[in-house]
Amino acid sequence: MTETEGRLGTHFLEVVAQELNRIKVRAEKAIAQLADDRRLHVKLDAESNSIAIVMMHLSGNMLSRWTDFLTADGEKPSRNRNAEFEAPETMTRAELMTAWERGWACLFGALDALTPADLTATVRIRGEQFSAMEAIVRQFDHYASHIGQIVFLAKHLEWERWQSLSVPRRRQ
């Protein structure tokens, strides 16, 4: 690996960590605006996911994908993906946040341990091979789409008192 490649790899890892943290915080700010824990479990229809379900799915995905990231298949036998979509309506905000933080801690721990040279390593997800860099980008895309769902649903539920998470559109 050349010096330039090493710097580029370091920069990539730093930017990914920074942007993942940014979307994590965005979701947490949206969740914080929910008036009560019951709203975490609201579904728009029978096929939709609640914020609680998305949180549990993200946590389960992160624990599976980022545990032994370079050495084991990203779909761990211990993961019960279907159960992630059946988050009990009795789960409190505190319980959900504990699971949420556990997933993110696993992700950031694995990401922090990577070196630029690791980015070209081959990793597997459900038996399919990817470069580590490609797997990271795919996971970022997955997480960003689900964070968007969390923000959308929180804004929908709290529309009357919603505080914009970015630059608010003009009000007439």
Report each predicted region and the residues it spans.
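Short, contiguous alpha-helical
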Residues: 2-3, 17-28, 37-84, 125-172
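Terminal targeting/low-complexity segments that flank the catalytic cores of oxidoreductases
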Residues: 1-9
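Acidic/histidine-rich alpha-helical segments that form the ligand environment
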Residues: 85-123, 133-143
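Active-site rim elements
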Residues: 9-17, 90-97
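Hydrophobic alpha-helical core bundles mediating ligand binding, dimerization, or RNAP-core interactions
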Residues: 16, 20, 24, 31, ...
